[in-house]
């Protein structure tokens, strides 16, 4: 038996597959999900989702920008604002974005702006980290 995974963004169903295993970036750390997982609703952080498809040792990686995951009866429904396949991210652009986001946060003196810059850095870090998984 496998898991039926749906990743939904505001505009559409982004991705649907039957998979063996999924690792989610929850607000309290990474959470692995296999078949017959207990039902749970969890918040997702900005980060990387890793998916292993049936009868494969290869993992598919996606960057998501927070949301929620509902796990119930071997169905995993993921609702996020943005999703992007790791394989579609340009390594050089991700590195530049990560470095500039890090620099902007370090140079910032405005407390109110720090929150936005921190979110930008988390997204840029996830995008850069996922490019390193492809190697």
UniProtKB/Swiss-Prot annotation:
What CDD domains does the record point to? F1-ATPase_delta (cd12152)
Under the heading Pfam families, the entry gives:
ATP-synt_DE_N
Q: Per its UniProt record, what InterPro entries does this chain match?
A: ATP_synth_F1_dsu/esu (IPR001469), ATP_synth_F1_dsu/esu_N (IPR020546), ATPsynth_dsu/esu_N (IPR036771)
**Topology relative to the membrane, per the entry?**
Peripheral membrane protein
Q: Which domain of life is it from?
A: Eukaryota
Subunit record text = F-type ATPases have 2 components, CF(1) - the catalytic core - and CF(0) - the membrane proton channel. CF(1) has five subunits: alpha(3), beta(3), gamma(1), delta(1), epsilon(1). CF(0) has three main subunits: a, b and c.
The record ties this protein, via HAMAP family, to: ATP_synth_epsil_bac (MF_00530)
Q: Could you identify this protein by its name?
A: ATP synthase epsilon chain, chloroplastic
């Amino acid at each position: 038996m496998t898991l039926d995974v749906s990743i939904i963004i505001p505009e559409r169903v982004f991705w649907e597959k039957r998979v063996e295993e999924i690792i989610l970036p929850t607000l309290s750390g990474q959470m692995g999900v296999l078949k017959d997982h207990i039902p749970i609703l969890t918040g997702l952080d900005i980060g990387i989702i890793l998916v292993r498809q049936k009868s494969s040792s290869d993992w598919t990686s996606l960057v998501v920008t927070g949301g929620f995951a509902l796990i119930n009866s071997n169905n995993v429904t993921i609702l996020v604002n943005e999703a992007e396949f790791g394989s579609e991210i340009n390594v050089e652009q991700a590195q530049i974005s990560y470095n500039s986001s890090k620099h902007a946060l370090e140079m910032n003196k405005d407390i109110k702006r720090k929150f936005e810059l921190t979110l930008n850095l988390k997204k840029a870090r996830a995008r850069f980290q996922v490019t390193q998984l492809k190697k």
